[in-house]
Amino acid sequence: ISWKENLRVAWFGSFLTGASISLVVPFMPIFVEQLGIEGDQVAFYAGLAISVSAVSAALVSPIWGILADKYGRKPMMIRAGLAMTITMGGLAFVPNIYWLIFLRLLNGVFTGFVPNATALIASQVPKDKSGAALGTLSTGVVAGTLTGPFVGGFIAEIFGIRNVFLLVGAFLFLAAILTIFFIKEDFQPVA
């Protein structure tokens, strides 16, 4: 198993995941308005739509960690990528604010690509290279998170907000596919 190859793929997947999460932030209030929310309620529902994902992720992350220890990091990366493909891509089709909040909640429930990529690389890299490898990996999610709002705003301006969600779904699907075919893991369950 080449940890360097895994690092390259995990970096790109983490970049796509970070970008996907932050792509939607700049225009969430506008999207909430398009769903029929008006006045002071726009800020509330936009904030709720953004934060509900983080809150649900915080609550279920320990469960995904236990399952990663039992079944491996790669399956958890694939699960997160494929599930978030549906939850984020599905936002393009929400008819109202309730579906938006529900899919954002589910998105948080099924998240976990980046922490599992980190755990995978940490378990494979030689000890004397762990700082450099994990530092490199973290630049992927940071670069994606920094790039996402600009790209999301640009795409929303030209192609419309709902198409940004489809693009995000495609990014997450690509991360899952790259993980399936190029990430290698010789997993031994944690005793």
Where are these regions (language model features)?
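Symmetry-related core transmembrane helices of the 12-TM Major Facilitator Superfamily/SLC fold
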Residues: 164-181
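Small-residue (Gly/Pro/Ala) motifs that create kinks and tight helix-helix packing interfaces
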Residues: 29, 144-156
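Residue-level signature of mid-helix packing/kink "hotspots" within the transmembrane helices
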Residues: 54-62, 112, 145-146
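Paired small-residue
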Residues: 87, 98-106
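Helix-loop junctions on the cytosolic side of multi-pass membrane transporters
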Residues: 179-190
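Cytoplasmic helix-loop-helix junction between adjacent transmembrane helices
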Residues: 103-141
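Helix-loop boundary and gating motifs at the non-cytosolic
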Residues: 3-38, 42-47
